[in-house]
Amino acid sequence: MIGGFLGAGKTTSVAALAEHLSAAGRTVGLITNDQGRELVDTAMLRSKGFATEEIPGGCFCCRFNSLVDAAGKLTESTRPDVFIAEPVGSCTDLVATVTYPLRRIYGDEFSIAPLSVLVDPVRAARVFGLSEGGQFSEKVIYIYRKQLEEADLIVINKTDLLEPDALTTLQAKLAEEFPNAEVLQISARTGEGLDAWFNRITDAEQIARNVMEVD
């Protein structure tokens, strides 16, 4: 799964990963998710030729059966050897509600890649007090931090938006705040850092984590 808050660049990154895997000879199936009934992301990914199923009207974390059904449809139509799932931008607690059930029920059929959570560097710098700007509500910050708390890989996207020194400071701050995660830098737009991220996703199965507490 590739998660992250709204505006982190998830769909662009999913497309880049799918293109990378396809070029390497892998068959890819994509699953998109949103709270609305019309998923623009689905149309964009399908326009690039990727087999894509969508789960509208609710998050993976409360529609696990729909996620499994979508994977089943892709298996019947395309027989992908890699699934990439993009949860809704406000979704959290994915390890407890998606990863653990998948591993328990379908452990013989699926290998679970590390959970990547993308961040917009400008927003992250504001959330963690590294730059000035409009403040977010406590509820937004709570969800934002919880998403990062369960990540195996925290992926700073849109690296072209900050100066190198600011990116280094942000990366160090995220590593300090979330020591269980590996922090990477990429730009899905320019391609910078994508190979290193893709290698981390495909080379390691998701590590076992304690289920986090969500209020």
Model-derived features: positions:
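Nucleotide-state-sensitive switch-loop elements of NTP-binding domains
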Residues: 1-3, 8, 12-142
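Canonical P-loop GTPase G-domain recognition
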Residues: 141-155, 159-215
